[in-house]
From Swiss-Prot:
Native source species: Ectopseudomonas mendocina
SUPFAM superfamilies reported for this sequence: Aspartate/ornithine carbamoyltransferase (SSF53671)
Name of protein: Ornithine carbamoyltransferase, catabolic
GO terms assigned for molecular function: amino acid binding; ornithine carbamoyltransferase activity
Organism ancestry: Bacteria, Pseudomonadati, Pseudomonadota, Gammaproteobacteria, Pseudomonadales
One Pfam family matching this protein: OTCace_N
Pathway(s) annotated for this protein in UniProt: Amino-acid degradation; L-arginine degradation via ADI pathway; carbamoyl phosphate from L-arginine: step 2/2
Annotated residues for binding of L-ornithine: 168, 232, 236-237
UniProt keyword annotation of Transferase present: yes
């Protein structure tokens, strides 16, 4: 290994240097190639990893499980219905129990302070699978995907995020781009921009890396000349459908549609989404929204014609969750 990341937490990427991030990206690329060519070697035999999910997931759970199994590790999936976490036992006590049984712990849930408390008391590496504030494993997958779809070096890559930028995706896309010297544009109503303290921290990173940061309320200005257009759902998991009315009114100008993609003015532009996406009315939630807002039957944050077009690389992005998570596990836990 190029340098030592052994037993290190991954909580937000705030404390990872650009060199750390590039190393994880390069290791992800190498592990992906090894899997595709059938030359992968197992470095995590006899390792045990606990997966705590207070929020449900498809991609994060599958990515951690397959990554661990590929490398010879064992996993235990823990959901709110199969544990005492938060009911009869605090997260602090849970951390001190699991840390004696497992080599690492993944947490996907709500507040950032919970995953940080886990890391404080577990005594083993803790990985943030998603909190309200940050989504670091997704960021590694996103940058790996962007690298795969352009010949440009990282500092020449330009991307825009459209939508609610106060959430984990807005925060994290701003952070990773600032760390790596990229050109990052955030387009959202000003009330939905990332918090001022987070923007200030990212601007400081940008000064060091040469990154360009733009926050604007004009979506077409944001996407002009970009290589990639990102978005995310407009409300978080668990929010009632009734809460969508005001959010739809605020964010409809930031819907990723054909007009927005063409406004990039780049024939090689690609669309990215961390998924799941409401791109039609075939899901239960999509159908409920379409019943109340018929103009959204063909997509909410992204339209069906964009999602089902060659612009969309969200499924490659989803696959790369597994390769980048594998890199995190190997770099942290492997005895090499």
């Amino acid at each position: 290994m190029a340098f030592n990341m052994h037993n290190r937490n991954l909580l937000s990427l705030m404390h990872h240097s650009p060199r750390d991030v590039r190393y994880l990206l390069d290791l992800s690329r190498d592990l992906k190639r090894a899997k595709y060519t059938g030359t992968e070697q197992q470095h995590l035999k006899r390792k045990n990893i606990a997966l705590i999910f207070e929020k449900t997931s498809t991609r994060t759970r599958c990515a951690f499980e397959v990554a661990a199994y590929d490398q010879g590790a064992n996993v235990t999936y823990i959901d709110p219905n199969s544990s005492q976490i938060g009911h009869k036992e605090s997260m602090k006590d849970t951390a001190r129990v699991l840390g004696r049984m497992y080599d690492a712990i993944e947490y996907r849930g709500f507040k950032q302070e919970i995953v940080e408390e886990l890391a404080t008391y577990a005594g083993v590496p803790v990985f943030n699978g998603l909190t309200a504030e940050y989504h670091p494993t997704q960021m590694l997958a996103d940058v790996l995907t962007m690298r795969e779809h352009t010949d440009k070096p990282l500092h020449d890559i330009t991307y825009a995020y459209l939508g609610d930028a106060r959430n984990n995706m807005g925060n994290s896309l701003l952070l990773i781009g600032a760390k790596l010297g990229m050109d990052v544009r955030i387009a959202a109503p000003k009330a939905l921009w990332p918090h001022d303290d987070h923007v200030a921290a990212c601007k400081k990173f940008a000064e060091e890396s040469g990154a360009r940061i733009t926050l604007t309320e004009d979506p077409k200005e944001a996407v002009k000349g970009v290589d990639f257009v990102h978005t995310d759902v407009w409300v978080s998991m668990g929010e009632p459908v009734e809460a969508w009315g005001e959010r739809i009114k605020e964010l409809l100008p930031y819907q990723v549609n054909v007009e927005i993609m063409k406004a990039a003015g780049n024939p090689r532009v690609k669309f990215m989404h961390c998924l799941p996406a409401f791109h039609n009315s075939e899901t239960k939630v999509g159908k409920q929204i379409a019943e109340q807002y018929p103009n959204l039957k063909n997509g909410i944050e992204v339209t069906e014609d964009v999602f089902e077009s060659p612009w969309n690389i969200a499924f490659e992005q989803a696959e790369n969750r597994m390769h980048t998570i594998k890199a995190i596990l190997v770099s942290t836990l492997a005895d090499i």
